[in-house]
């Protein structure tokens, strides 16, 4: 079980919260997380790359020159893959790259990834009321009060639900990504230096993923 301190808008500790999610065993944890990460990255591929074979390129139905007697190499079509503007040999065609993974395994990987980042996890009180209007400077100052180095570190901010002012305040910060608890994913959990989560968002995560089902 890991215990995280809760910080308010000013960076002062206001309490503690326990994070004790059922995770994979030490022997299988890295592999389960790897499979979930691989699935997410592969499934994000569009798979729409497409090329034309020699039979699909427009033209090339007539033989360019007779077979023998010209002194040139024989050719049957101007759309041969050997020719400029010809077809493509073994080029990509639209395909589905989807990798399936059991729901229980996906949830296990997500819990394991989150629990493994507990040392980089910062829990804060709900601060929607602190941003009356979109103010990037105020959000940056809050991150610094919470102990995050904004100059060189990437941040994942997890909210219970979408907050317009918070989203607009963080929109032009290249090292900050804002997601809701319902969109939690393995890649974001592993790819950032710090994870900042609001108390209500963490409770929703524990409620959703805490039980083994």
UniProtKB/Swiss-Prot annotation:
The keyword RNA-binding applies. It comes from the Bacteria. Residues 60-71 have a biased composition (Basic residues). One of its GO terms (biological process) is translation. Residues 48-72 are annotated as: Disordered. One of its GO terms (cellular component) is ribosome. Pfam families: Ribosomal_L4. The keyword Ribosomal protein applies. GO terms for molecular function: rRNA binding; structural constituent of ribosome. Keywords: Ribonucleoprotein, Ribosomal protein, RNA-binding, rRNA-binding. Part of the 50S ribosomal subunit. Belongs to the universal ribosomal protein uL4 family. One of the primary rRNA binding proteins, this protein initially binds near the 5'-end of the 23S rRNA. It is important during the early stages of 50S assembly. It makes multiple contacts with different domains of the 23S rRNA in the assembled 50S subunit and ribosome. This is Large ribosomal subunit protein uL4.
